[in-house]
Amino acid sequence: MSEKIVQLNEEVIKGQLKELVRGSVEETLNELLEAEAEKLTQAARYERNEQRQGYRSGHYNRNLTTTSGDVTLKVPKLKGISFETAIIERYRRRESSVEEALIEMYLAGVSVRRVEDITEALWGSKVSPATISELNKKAYVPIEDWRNRPLQGGRYPYVYVDGIYLCRNWGGEFENVAILVAIAVNEDGYREVLGAAEGMKEDKASWISFFQWLRGRGLDGVKLVVGDKCLGMLEAVGEVFPEAKYQRCTVHFYHNVFSVTPRSKVKLVAKMLKAIHAQESKKSAREKARAVVAQLRSMKLKEAARKVEDGIEETLTYCDFPSEHWTRIRTNNVIERLNREIRRRTRVVGSFPDGNSALMLVCARLRHVAGTQWGNKKYMNMKHLEAALEDASIAG
């Protein structure tokens, strides 16, 4: 008797298994959302009890891309209480990291075969080589939208600016391109990434264009701009934000003095400079600065003395603001930490094919950082500034 041979269609089976897994993932995630809602409201659906916080108001659908495929989340709508699900938040962080990784792969010259393997691991399907470049273009779109978003944090009293130099391969020749970066502390005391733009070089025209772009997106209420003494920046601040004052970063100022100081005397000079900015008033800081200049001259450090004498006043602007804010507004450290992270990420690329590629990778990183605890943790108590403004001690 002949035996029946059963032929299995491997592709059909794989498709059915994938759909089974996708369905299971979708069901599990929706159960987790319901559990989150129950925990927040302290009650199950339709349950009435004295501990209940808020009420159900149906659901809304939200698509989520997972390694098992696209799933539809039924997100509970609540009345009387806000519902920020941890699942969506984790997705946002993952989405930002995927965009950044995709751009990095493209810029770093990863082989097409390797990119195919990675995209299959991320999205569950292998893309063709012709599609890879399109994926990178698509990754640029949300980053560019974020970069040009309206600034809605109200007023931004403190603004920090800096420039990052990255290497660009322009027609076979390597040259540096400046990416101008700005962050701020808003009127509620939270840090916010304002934006980044290609500046070609740090000059007056680039800074004016950058500041006007920020102002056009909603940057307002600027009282102080903190940054290094870059070429043309001080003049640009005066033109675009005439009511704002300028604070030269004390750390950059120190390094400028160290550049003309013998290595054997740097530690001593650093101690002398820090003593100036440890004073409790602008008057005493000026007096201390005069003493430091005299001491430097007695040490035969005439060039260092000249730099201190010429530049010290620009480093004392912070004294016009609440003393509670001094340590955080006299340096550019808050933006320098971000820049170090950006440099760590861009170092693996080496040289960029164009300025826009460099800008997109920088913005991808800034966008990621902005969505973390960095931007959600209060940085300053702005009531001190409000009180000072009411006393008209900073007006003008």
Residue ranges of model-derived segments:
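Short, positively charged, Gly/Tyr-enriched micro-motifs
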Residues: 1-5, 11-14, 21-28, 65-154, ...
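Subset of Sec-pathway N-terminal targeting signals
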Residues: 2-12, 20-30, 34-55
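Acidic/histidine-rich catalytic cores and adjacent linkers
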Residues: 2-4, 35-38, 42-43, 107, ...
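Metal-dependent DNA phosphodiester-chemistry modules and their immediately adjacent helices/loops
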Residues: 84, 257-291
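Conserved beta-strand -> loop -> alpha-helix junction used to position metal-binding or nucleic-acid-contacting
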Residues: 224-231, 236-272
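N-terminal juxtadomain amphipathic helix
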Residues: 43-74
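RNase H-like nuclease fold core
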Residues: 74-79, 87-92, 125-126, 131-226, ...
